[in-house]
UniProtKB/Swiss-Prot annotation:
Its cofactor is Fe(2+). One of its GO terms (cellular component) is cytoplasm. Fe cation binds at H101, D103, H251. Belongs to the TfdA dioxygenase family. Coiled coil: none annotated. Homohexamer. Dimer of trimers. It is found in: Cytoplasm. It comes from Pectobacterium carotovorum subsp. carotovorum (Erwinia carotovora subsp. carotovora). This is (5R)-carbapenem-3-carboxylate synthase.
């Protein structure tokens, strides 16, 4: 009989899983991985760990997605655990918005699990959330005119924050497959445009669409995906751990561009390779 771990659903639809930190630490990695495939994401509160313990935890889930050798410059040279500390002048590691996306696509890397841990949170209550979207359910219930575009049109993206992506990402525009059928789920790889006034790390386009049409599509799609049935918003507190199955959900970061806010997260990524 397969191991089980006690959890409570996060969302009214039954999606997501709250797990007590004691149960999480005692559970087998494989049990949590299987739960993630079904529930999409896991939230653990009050987990008191340092960056080494964080690495020990996430490294058990698969092959660490790390950037060494010819990829050593990625993320300004972070290698494995990326510290998201709200650096001025940076975007991915900065304080601005990161609109809906899945990890790995811009660096042509397979990323199956994403781990975020709150090392230090101060002076922020209702800003800088990480949000998670149940794209599989959303696509089942989506208006046909939106789904048709996702399934039939060609989506491209180009990176703008060269200091982060260095020369690992392709130059110029490149195609990103929106859906990849993995059998148990259709993985979604999509990069939403940044809001006006936000420094942009990437830029998407839809081949054959005007700028106006592209903007209108993403606005309507974003409004649909952000309905409470599909959308969870996590406001960070010290000791929070959020694990996402990168094939089962897409996520975003809301801006927290206030000098008084301290929002230090550790990020790890693993792949089933």
């Amino acid at each position: 009989m397969s191991e089980i771990v006690k959890f409570n659903p996060v969302m009214a639809s039954g999606f997501g899983a709250y797990i007590d930190h004691r149960d999480f630490l005692e559970a087998k990695t494989e049990t949590i991985k299987n739960l993630l495939m079904r529930q999409g994401f896991v939230v653990v509160k009050n987990l008191d760990i340092d960056s080494d313990t964080f690495r020990d935890i996430y490294s058990a889930y698969g092959t660490i997605v790390e950037y060494a050798d010819e990829k050593i410059g990625v993320g300004f040279g972070y290698r494995d655990t990326l510290k998201l500390e709200g650096e001025k002048g940076k975007i991915v590691t900065g304080r601005g918005q990161l609109p809906f996306h899945a990890d790995g696509g811009l660096l042509l890397s397979q990323v199956d699990q994403v781990f975020l841990y709150a090392a230090e949170i101060k002076n922020v209550k209702f800003r800088g959330a990480t949000t998670v979207c149940d794209h599989a359910l959303a696509c089942q219930e989506m208006p046909a005119h939106l789904l048709r575009v996702l399934e039939e049109e060609t989506f491209e993206v180009r990176v703008l924050e060269r200091g982060y992506y260095v020369d690992v990402s392709p130059d110029g525009w490149f195609k990103v497959p929106v859906f990849t059928d993995l059998g148990w789920v259709r993985k979604m790889l999509i990069y939403f445009p940044f809001d006006e006034g936000q420094p942009a790390s990437w830029e998407p386009r839809i081949v054959g669409f005007t700028d106006h049409e592209t903007q209108a599509f993403f606005q309507e799609l974003g409004a649909f995906l952000k309905q409470p049935r599909y959308y969870y918003k996590h406001f960070w507190e010290d000791g929070d751990l959020l694990i996402m199955d990168n094939r089962r959900v897409i996520h975003e970061r809301e801006e927290f561009n206030d000098d008084d806010i301290v929002r230090r997260l550790y990020r790890g990524q693993t792949a089933d390779i």
